[in-house]
């Protein structure tokens, strides 16, 4: 029977019960087990629990150290950007065979009257590799020899929020850690003055919101931290009036001591996270404003990214005040973060959900993204950072070759959700550039060659960072969880 103050009870967590109920060599053995599972941190200076973001070694030699994931929320049309389909010109206005659509669940398309829709875009070849890309992406086209374009990604999720969860966390349900959280859990962070995982947003916001960068059941130290590119980088980071640095330091030291005592009793990793977050916030009061201060960047660099660009008119879903400048600035900040040791940077833009007005709105979004994304790749390469920085462009799914016909429209001006085949591209970080991997059928309905499920993409990403995806696990509620769930196969064709 357990007695005493319930607040101090050794039964307050399963870990504390296991740790305190053992004795002698049993305690040492248990501590070793917890350490192996990542549930018990090594001691830091002065006997304090080590930071959960302390650097750690992967399973084998990594090719990548950092990742910048550009997430175009809403699902860009791969047929109008990355995957040319001349057959759609021939079949424009004709229905697909019923055998291809009878068991398909659409978000909005009415099956009985749905017909194929051509792309008005011109595709041209770029680089020595001859990669075909849309005329909406001339700047990215200039990076073709550094890019691996995958045209055969697929998923089972056809609605935005589940699809975004699938791409960002490996499963289509709430409560699981995101890719950036898994990498910081596995590797720790090389930055002492900035978070290991930073999120930058532009546009109207993704439907998945913060669930896309959550730490899930991992300790909260591994969650993404939302930064703002202008003004106060993180809300409420500054001291309130009247709180000087000496009093602040004394308060933090007192909190650290109290939390360390509690950690010694419970071994709760959330207490480690709390100690680390307080100390990091203190250091970021100086480092975060310095990060977003671009006055030390040359004019040529600012112009390359387009940080002073003016928005185009007719924005549609992807617009917002100063969206061109904001997205460009976010790409530049991502490079500055990688230089400062940030492990994982997410850049979100929304929305690319073009159910209608595809021509106008895709032109707007692509023009916004094309220049700064290409500048990011080129800038990283010029500075010697691309070799160990993985850059990813992706989204939750693609768009249908069928035009969207809801509402009785006489003309189709958009495309519906399409998880059966879509495109992503990667550069740097051990990726073999200048290649196209995968192939879809003649109308872009199914991936038919080198098919790559999202779990396979995640397995490949972890491999580039030195991890066997089946061994990077975290025990939660009696089960070992991993980013790739119960699947995943490394796509070796992508790796140099």
Where are the regions that the model predicts?
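Ligand-binding pockets and gating/stacking loops
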Residues: 1-496
